């Protein structure tokens, strides 16, 4: 997977726009959000995407994101916070409550480093965003070599990140997949971050300028002679 669209169930998107996203050349979708997430909206969005053969990931920020019928679940583990609630606290509580029913083969953990200090998710998780390049590289190595996380996710959350930081983080990883998300609003930015990340995630621009969002996926289409 090189490209994923991230959809917020709290935001409305016409069916025609969803159809365009499905046929854009993207490799799949993440359904996830921070604010005002209701299970009914998650269910509706998941069902609207249900006709596609593309993978649909539910990113579990709270219990309202859990649909038992989903094929793929993403579990964020925020690495750059001192609040253990976001590294393992909420996770342990949910496992305690539902552990016997969790379909572990459909669950993937992602090690998050959140780097936009103004983002809602940074405030919510109390993320320490004032990091050096060396700090971020160390988190990448921590994710891969200590926690053995399958995904390391650098999240600028609405702000376009520093390509050099992304390059260094990606170069530090061998087996863990490197995902980048944040502020991609053009095919040029998509191509730039795709040089360093295994997968780029495109979100906000979907709701701001759909055509530009679609262009970010077209760069990955296989060319035919």
From Swiss-Prot:
Gene3D superfamilies: FMN-linked oxidoreductases. Pfam families: PcrB. Its EC number is 2.5.1.n9. It is an enzyme of class 2 (transferase). Mg(2+) binds at residues 8, 34. CDD domains: PcrB_like. GO terms for molecular function: heptaprenylglyceryl phosphate synthase activity; magnesium ion binding. InterPro entries: GGGP/HepGP_synthase_I (IPR039074), GGGP/HepGP_synthase_sf (IPR038597), GGGP_HepGP_synthase (IPR008205). Prenyltransferase that catalyzes in vivo the transfer of the heptaprenyl moiety of heptaprenyl pyrophosphate (HepPP; 35 carbon atoms) to the C3 hydroxyl of sn-glycerol-1-phosphate (G1P), producing heptaprenylglyceryl phosphate (HepGP). This reaction is an ether-bond-formation step in the biosynthesis of archaea-type G1P-based membrane lipids found in Bacillales. This is Heptaprenylglyceryl phosphate synthase. It comes from Listeria monocytogenes serotype 4a (strain HCC23). The lineage of its organism: Bacteria, Bacillati, Bacillota, Bacilli, Bacillales. The gene is pcrB.
């Amino acid at each position: 997977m090189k490209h994923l669209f991230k959809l917020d169930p709290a935001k409305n998107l016409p069916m025609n726009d969803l159809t365009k996203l499905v046929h854009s050349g993207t490799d799949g979708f993440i359904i996830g959000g921070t604010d005002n997430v209701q299970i009914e909206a998650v269910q509706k969005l998941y069902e609207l995407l249900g006709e596609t053969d593309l993978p649909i990931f539910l990113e579990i920020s709270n219990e309202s994101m859990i649909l038992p019928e989903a094929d793929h679940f993403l579990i964020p583990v925020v690495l750059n916070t001192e609040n253990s609630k976001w590294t393992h606290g909420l996770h342990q509580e949910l496992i305690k409550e539902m552990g016997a029913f969790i379909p572990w083969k459909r669950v993937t953990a992602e090690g998050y480093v959140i780097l936009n200090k103004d983002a809602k998710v940074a405030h919510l998780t109390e993320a320490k965003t004032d990091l050096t390049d060396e700090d971020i590289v160390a988190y990448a190595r921590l994710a891969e070599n200590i926690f053995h996380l399958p995904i390391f996710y650098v999240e600028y959350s609405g702000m376009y990140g520093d390509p050099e930081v992304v390059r260094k983080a990606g170069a530090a990883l061998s087996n863990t997949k490197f995902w980048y998300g944040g502020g991609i609003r053009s095919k040029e930015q998509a191509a730039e971050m795709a040089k360093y990340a295994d997968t780029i995630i495109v979100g906000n621009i979907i709701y701001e300028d759909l055509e530009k969002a679609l262009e970010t996926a077209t760069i990955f289409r296989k060319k035919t002679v």
